C-alpha cells in the first residue's frame, strides 16, 4: 500500500508486549490495514533489530511499537472498539479469534498522538536540553504527514503556520520534496512552548498534520578528541596534480585551506557564504577529513589524490563553537541543493564519489528510512554518483560487570569477549546513525586500527588488539535486513583510562587525548602545520573514499572494458566490496560473541559487513587469480547470463579454489511504500561444482541491499569437459511495477593459492570471450 496520501487520523499505534514474530503473523491474517514501515511482502524471520533473541536465536518478549494505516475510518473505529472490549472482558464473540490472537501480543492500541511525535530516539532528551538552555527562542523541525496533493500539503503547512503564530513563534524555513515524499518546517518558538510540547499540552504537538517533532542543527559524526589536540609538524608533500577536475566531493565543515597538507589541493565551493564567520580554530572536522581523503593516515601517508578535492561546507559553528548543520536549515534540503550543484555545475560534474562523514545522533536506525537516507538513495540513482557514508560513532563508557581487578586479571581473549558481549547487549542503542541506512550508499564502519607508532600508554589501556571492530563503531544491520555496514576500515585506536584501584567497578572511560598517538594523524587547526591524532567512523569513511578515487583511475586503465561513464560509480562500489572478506577479524569476533549458525553470520555482518577491503586483490590479476568484469543494464523480469570460462588446469585438480562474485547497482525507490527498494537484482552461479560451498555472509541477507557479494570455495577434484563455463545468471526480480532500466556491474574472481603454481590466467585469457545471453 502506498501511503503518500495518508490521512493522519487513520494511523494506529500498536504497542507490542508479546512475541514480535507472533504479532507479525497475527497482523498479516487480518485484512484492512497495512504497514507504514518496512514489511515488504518477503518472508520474515524474527529480527534482533526489533526483537530480543535468546541464546538460541529465538524470538523472546520485548516491548515494541508498530504503526498501521487503516483503510477506512469505520474499520479504524471497529478495531479500537474491539480492543476496548478485549481490555474489559478478555474475550470475543464467535468468529473474532484472529483479533484475540493479535491482541494477546499487545500492550496498547491507540491513534497516533503527541507521545509518538516525540518518540524517536533521544529526541525528548535533546528538546528538554534546549528548553532549559535557551532563555528565549528555540528552533525545532516539524515533519508533516506527506500528501501527494499539493493542495493538501499547502493546507497542512498553513495550519502549522497558524498554530505557530498563535504560540508567538514564526516560520523559519519550509521544504517539500515529492521524489522522496518529505515535508518539513523549521519554526522558532519560545522555550516555554517547547516545554508545553514535552508536556503534551501545546496545540502544535496535538496537531494531526504533524508526524514528528525534532531538534535542529544536530548532524555531525563528531571525531573523538579533546579540545586542545593540535601539535606542530612539518610535512613535505608532492604537490603535483595529474588532473584538476575533481573525482571526489567532501560535504563537511569548512577546511583550513592554507594548511600545508591541503594547500593548492582543494576546490572550496561556499555558495552560502559561511566562511566569513567560520573561525580558523573551529575548522576541525572538514580539515581532518580533507587531510585523510587526500593523504590517508599521515602516520604512513599514501600517494596523494591525483585530482583536486571538491569541498562544499554543510556545517557552520554554533555559539559554543561546535560544528553542526545550521539550526535554521533543513538538512535534507541542504543535501539536495549541495548535490544538485555538484552534479550540474561545470567545475564539479566530474565527481563520482561524495564523502559524507556525518551521523545524526538523534536518528538511530530501527525500522524506517530517515528522510536523509531517502534523499541519498534518490540522488545516487538520479545522478549515478556513489555516496560513501560513515556508519556513525557511539563513543561511550564500557560498564562491565565486576571489579576492575577481576577484569584486569583475565587473559586478553576473555577481556575481549566481555567487551564485545557488553556492546552487543546494548546493540539497540548503538545502531546506524542516519543517513547510514541508505540502501544505495556504501556504509563504512570502523576497525580499531591506525598506522601510528607504538605509543607510551601513560595511564591508558588498550583492551582489544588491532584490526578488531572499534568499540565506538555503530552496529548494523540495514533496511529489510540488508548487510550494513557494507564494509569496515581503519578508524583509529581508542584507548581507555587506567583504573588505579582494583576494587573499583570495571567502568572503562574513554581517553580523549589527541595530542599524541594512537589515532590517525591528520591536518588540524589552528595553524598551517598543526596536526592531531583522531579516531572515528568518519576517518574510516574518508580513507575508503580515497581508495575509491584510486580505483577510478585503475578502472579507466582496464583494456577493452569500455565502461560507460554512468557506470563508474557503480563499478567503484563493486570493486571496493569485491576485495572484502571476514578473514581473521570474523573468526576472532565470533569467538568473542559465541554465536553459531545463521545468528553467527548475522552477528558478524552487523559488525563488519562484508569485511575489510583489500585493494591489491582487485587492482590486477596474477597467474593464480583472475578477475573478470561485466556490465550492462537490466529491466524487470529479465535475466542476463555471463560465462566465466574454467581453465583446463583445474580439471580433476584437488586443491583449494575460491570464486568471489560481486554484483552492484543503484535502485530507484518507492519512498513511502512498504516495498522501498524497486530494483531487486541478484545473481546465481550455475555449473559451479568446483567451488560449491558458500562462505561468510548469509546467502539471504546478501540479496536485500544493492550489492550482493558472495564467496564460494571447494577442494574436491571435479572432472569437467574442456570448454566448460560457470554461468553467472543476473536477474531482476519483480517488486512493484518498475519501468526503469537498471545499470549494474558484475565482478567475478577465480583463484587458487599462489603456491599451486597453476596457469589460470593464461588459460582463461586464451578462452575468454564474454558473451551475454538475455532471457525475458
Indicate residue ranges for each PLM-predicted region.
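Extended low-complexity, serine/threonine- and proline-enriched intrinsically disordered segments
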Residues: 8-50, 140-144, 151-168, 657-706
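Secreted peptidase-domain scaffold signal
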Residues: 594-678, 682
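Structured lumen-facing ectodomains of secretory-pathway proteins
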Residues: 209-211, 393-493, 497-503
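C-terminal edge strands of extracellular/lumenal beta-sandwich accessory domains
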Residues: 677-690, 718-776
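Catalytic-core environment of secreted peptidases
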Residues: 253-272, 447-461, 468-541, 558
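Subtilisin-like serine protease catalytic core
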Residues: 236-270, 275-330, 363-365, 384, ...
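Autoinhibitory propeptides
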Residues: 1-13, 25-138, 158-238
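Substrate-binding/access-modulating region of protease and related hydrolase catalytic domains
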Residues: 155, 318-438, 528-535, 539-541
Amino acid at each position: 500500500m502506498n501511503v503518500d496520501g495518508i490521512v493522519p487520523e487513520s494511523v494506529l499505534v500498536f504497542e507490542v508486549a508479546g512475541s514480535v514474530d507472533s504479532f507479525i503473523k497475527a497482523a498479516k491474517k487480518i485484512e484492512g490495514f497495512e504497514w507504514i514501515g518496512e514489511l515488504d511482502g518477503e518472508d520474515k524471520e524474527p529480527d534482533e533489530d526489533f526483537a530480543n533473541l535468546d541464546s538460541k536465536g529465538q524470538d523472546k518478549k520485548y516491548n515494541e511499537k508498530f504503526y498501521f494505516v487503516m483503510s477506512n475510518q469505520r474499520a479504524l473505529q471497529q478495531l479500537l472498539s474491539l480492543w476496548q472490549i478485549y481490555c474489559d472482558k478478555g474475550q470475543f464473540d464467535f468468529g473474532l479469534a484472529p483479533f484475540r490472537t493479535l491482541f494477546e501480543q499487545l500492550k496498547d492500541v491507540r491513534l497516533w498522538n503527541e507521545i509518538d511525535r516525540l518518540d524517536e530516539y533521544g529526541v525528548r532528551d535533546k528538546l528538554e536540553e534546549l528548553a532549559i538552555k535557551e532563555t528565549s527562542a528555540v528552533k525545532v523541525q516539524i515533519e508533516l504527514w506527506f500528501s501527494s496533493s499539493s493542495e493538501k500539503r499547502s493546507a497542512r503547512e498553513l495550519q502549522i503556520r497558524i498554530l505557530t503564530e498563535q504560540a508567538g513563534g514564526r516560520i523559519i524555513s519550509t521544504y517539500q520534496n515529492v521524489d522522496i515524499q518529505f515535508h518539513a518546517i523549521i519554526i522558532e518558538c519560545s522555550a516555554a512552548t517547547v516545554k508545553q510540547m514535552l508536556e503534551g499540552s501545546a496545540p502544535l504537538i496535538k496537531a494531526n498534520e504533524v508526524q514528528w517533532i525534532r531538534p535542529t542543527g544536530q548532524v555531525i559524526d563528531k571525531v573523538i578528541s579533546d579540545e586542545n589536540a593540535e601539535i606542530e609538524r612539518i610535512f613535505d608533500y608532492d604537490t603535483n596534480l595529474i588532473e584538476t577536475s575533481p573525482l571526489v566531493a567532501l560535504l563537511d565543515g569548512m577546511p583550513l585551506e592554507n594548511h600545508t597538507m591541503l594547500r593548492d589541493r582543494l576546490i572550496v565551493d561556499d555558495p552560502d557564504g559561511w566562511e566569513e564567520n567560520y573561525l580558523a580554530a573551529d575548522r576541525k572536522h572538514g580539515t581532518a577529513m580533507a587531510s585523510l581523503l587526500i593523504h590517508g593516515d599521515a602516520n604512513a601517508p599514501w600517494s596523494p589524490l591525483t585530482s583536486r578535492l571538491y569541498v562544499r561546507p554543510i556545517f557552520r559553528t554554533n555559539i559554543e563553537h561546535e560544528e553542526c548543520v545550521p539550526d535554521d536549515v533543513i538538512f535534507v534540503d541542504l543535501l539536495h541543493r549541495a548535490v544538485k550543484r555538484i552534479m550540474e555545475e561545470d567545475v564539479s560534474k566530474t565527481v563520482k564519489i561524495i564523502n559524507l562523514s556525518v551521523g545524526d545522533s538523534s536518528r538511530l536506525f530501527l525500522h524506517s528510512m530517515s528522510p536523509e537516507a531517502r534523499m541519498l538513495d534518490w540522488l545516487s540513482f538520479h545522478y549515478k554518483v556513489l555516496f560513501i557514508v560513515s556508519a556513525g560513532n557511539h563513543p561511550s563508557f564500557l560498564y562491565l560487570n565486576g571489579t576492575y581487578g577481576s577484569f584486569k586479571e583475565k587473559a586478553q581473549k576473555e577481556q575481549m569477549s566481555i567487551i564485545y558481549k557488553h556492546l552487543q547487549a546494548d546493540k539497540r542503542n548503538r545502531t546506524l546513525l542516519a543517513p547510514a541506512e541508505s540502501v544505495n550508499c556504501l556504509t563504512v564502519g570502523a576497525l580499531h586500527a591506525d598506522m601510528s607508532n607504538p605509543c607510551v600508554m601513560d595511564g591508558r589501556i588498550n583492551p582489544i588488539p588491532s584490526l578488531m571492530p572499534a568499540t565506538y563503531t555503530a552496529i548494523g544491520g540495514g533496511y529489510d535486513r540488508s548487510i550494513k555496514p557494507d564494509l569496515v576500515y581503519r578508524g583509529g585506536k581508542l584507548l581507555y583510562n587506567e583504573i588505579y584501584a582494583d576494587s573499583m567497578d570495571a567502568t572503562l572511560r574513554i581517553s580523549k587525548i589527541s595530542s599524541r598517538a594512537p589515532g590517525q594523524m591528520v591536518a588540524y587547526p589552528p595553524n598551517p602545520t598543526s596536526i592531531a591524532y583522531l579516531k572515528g567512523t568518519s576517518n574510516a569513511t574518508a580513507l575508503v573514499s580515497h581508495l575509491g578515487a584510486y580505483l577510478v583511475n585503475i578502472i579507466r586503465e582496464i583494456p577493452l572494458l569500455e565502461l560507460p561513464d554512468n557506470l563508474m560509480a557503480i563499478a567503484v562500489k563493486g570493486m571496493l566490496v569485491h576485495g572484502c572478506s571476514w578473514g581473521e577479524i570474523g573468526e576472532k569476533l565470533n569467538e568473542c560473541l559465541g554465536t553459531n549458525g545463521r545468528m553467527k553470520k548475522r552477528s558478524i555482518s552487523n559488525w563488519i559487513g562484508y569485511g575489510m577491503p583489500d585493494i591489491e586483490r582487485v587492482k590486477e590479476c596474477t597467474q593464480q587469480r583472475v578477475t573478470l568484469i561485466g556490465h550492462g543494464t537490466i529491466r524487470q523480469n529479465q535475466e542476463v547470463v555471463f560465462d566465466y570460462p574454467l581453465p583446463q588446469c583445474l580439471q580433476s585438480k584437488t586443491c583449494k579454489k575460491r570464486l568471489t562474485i560481486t554484483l552492484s547497482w543503484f535502485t530507484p525507490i518507492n519512498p513511502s511504500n512498504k516495498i522501498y527498494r524497486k530494483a531487486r537484482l541478484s545473481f546465481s552461479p550455475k555449473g559451479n561444482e568446483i567451488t560449491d560451498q558458500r562462505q561468510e555472509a548469509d546467502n539471504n541477507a546478501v540479496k536485500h541491499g544493492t550489492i550482493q557479494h558472495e564467496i564460494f570455495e571447494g577442494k574436491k577434484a571435479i572432472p569437467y569437459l574442456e570448454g566448460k563455463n560457470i554461468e553467472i545468471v543476473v536477474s531482476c526480480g519483480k517488486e512493484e511495477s518498475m519501468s526503469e532500466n537498471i545499470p549494474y556491474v558484475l565482478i567475478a574472481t577465480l583463484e587458487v593459492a599462489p603456491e599451486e603454481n597453476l596457469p589460470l590466467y593464461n588459460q582463461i585469457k586464451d578462452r575468454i570471450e564474454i558473451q551475454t545471453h538475455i532471457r525475458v
